[in-house]
């Protein structure tokens, strides 16, 4: 009997250690302070800039090892805003994003790596019904600080460049008219749940 109690006690202690170290925190984007900005070359002359302002999803951080964290972000494609309503309507149409058929884009991480300047987050971006691997260069997390909602908030900035034609977006337009490279800048203010 003493042996069983001792074995049970040792098993409890040996399992409690790793479980305590593997605590995670769940963070969600603050929609008022998070966005995905994009820029693309127009007629090889100037950049057209815009943003998606309705960002959702979760970031689950491993408190002991950030490289074991996961990212699952959803972008409402219908929230596209370039400051020109006619262009925004065209971007939502089948000519570009086809938001009626593909109203959301998602990014799901596959790995997180520490770098000298922050993090590299690898994952799969699904946009316009096409999924491609994407690598984000991430600065952060910053904070946490207490937000107006009395929850801890942290910040992340991420950048990447994608090919619009790889995602089947506006494939009929040559690169001389609309650049193929689209620069993305992601600003996330996330609140701990």
Place the predicted regions along the sequence by residue.
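Bacterial N-terminal signal peptides that target proteins for export
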Residues: 1-8
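Bacterial N-terminal signal peptides
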Residues: 8-18
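Low-complexity, acidic/polar, glycine-enriched regions of mature
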Residues: 20-193
């Amino acid at each position: 009997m003493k042996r069983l109690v001792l074995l049970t006690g040792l098993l409890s202690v040996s399992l409690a250690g790793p479980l305590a170290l593997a605590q995670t925190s769940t963070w969600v984007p603050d929609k008022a302070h998070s966005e995905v900005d994009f820029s693309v070359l127009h007629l090889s002359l100037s950049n057209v800039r815009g943003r998606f302002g309705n960002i959702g999803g979760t970031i689950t951080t491993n408190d002991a090892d950030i490289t074991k964290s996961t990212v699952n972000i959803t972008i409402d494609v219908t929230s596209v805003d370039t400051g020109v309503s006619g262009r925004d309507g065209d971007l939502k149409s089948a000519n570009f994003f086809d938001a009626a058929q593909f109203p959301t884009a998602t990014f799901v991480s596959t790995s997180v790596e520490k770098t000298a300047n922050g993090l590299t987050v690898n994952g799969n971006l699904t946009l316009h019904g096409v999924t491609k691997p994407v690598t984000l260069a991430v600065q952060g997390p910053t904070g946490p600080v207490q937000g107006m909602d009395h929850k801890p908030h942290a910040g992340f900035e991420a950048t990447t460049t994608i090919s619009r034609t790889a995602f089947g977006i506006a494939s009929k337009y040559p690169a001389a008219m609309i650049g193929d490279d689209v620069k993305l800048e992601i600003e996330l203010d996330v609140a701990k749940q």
